[in-house]
Amino acid sequence: MSLISIVCLIPFGLIGAVNPIITLSAYAVLGGMYLLVVPLFLFYWMNNRWNVMGKLERLFIYGLVFLFFPGMILFAPFLNLRMNGKEGS
């Protein structure tokens, strides 16, 4: 049975999917992207462009925040994104 599944995967270039090390590595990379890389990029993007974003960009960013919410929650206690107050008053 395993030989049949390997033969069926060869035309698609998925022979590496049978190796558990490659599979676990792929899960680790995708999980790291989902929980660490993309949420940090979203925090950076929102912090820099908050006052100049257009309607469609804001809608797109809010959609990504909804999609990557678990990673955003991980970093929320450690990042301060409050606006700076008026200086020199």
From Swiss-Prot:
Membrane topology reported for the UniProt record: Multi-pass membrane protein
Recorded catalytic activity of this chain's protein: a plastoquinone + NADH + (n+1) H(+)(in) = a plastoquinol + NAD(+) + n H(+)(out); a plastoquinone + NADPH + (n+1) H(+)(in) = a plastoquinol + NADP(+) + n H(+)(out)
GO cellular component, one term: plasma membrane-derived thylakoid membrane
Enzyme Commission identifier(s): 7.1.1.-
Subcellular location: Cellular thylakoid membrane
Keyword Metal-binding in record: no
Keywords: Membrane, NAD, NADP, Plastoquinone, Quinone, Thylakoid, Translocase, Transmembrane, Transmembrane helix, Transport
Protein name (database record): NAD(P)H-quinone oxidoreductase subunit L
UniProt main location, coarse: membrane
Transmembrane intervals: 29-46, 59-79
Job of this protein: NDH-1 shuttles electrons from an unknown electron donor, via FMN and iron-sulfur (Fe-S) centers, to quinones in the respiratory and/or the photosynthetic chain. The immediate electron acceptor for the enzyme in this species is believed to be plastoquinone. Couples the redox reaction to proton translocation, and thus conserves the redox energy in a proton gradient. Cyanobacterial NDH-1 also plays a role in inorganic carbon-concentration.
Family annotation (InterPro entries): NADH-quinone_OxRdatse_su_L (IPR019654)
The organism's taxonomic lineage, starting at the top: Bacteria, Bacillati, Cyanobacteriota, Cyanophyceae, Synechococcales
Organism of derivation: Prochlorococcus marinus (strain NATL2A)
Record text on subunit structure and interactions: NDH-1 can be composed of about 15 different subunits; different subcomplexes with different compositions have been identified which probably have different functions.
Single GO MF annotation: oxidoreductase activity, acting on NAD(P)H, quinone or similar compound as acceptor
Family: Belongs to the complex I NdhL subunit family.
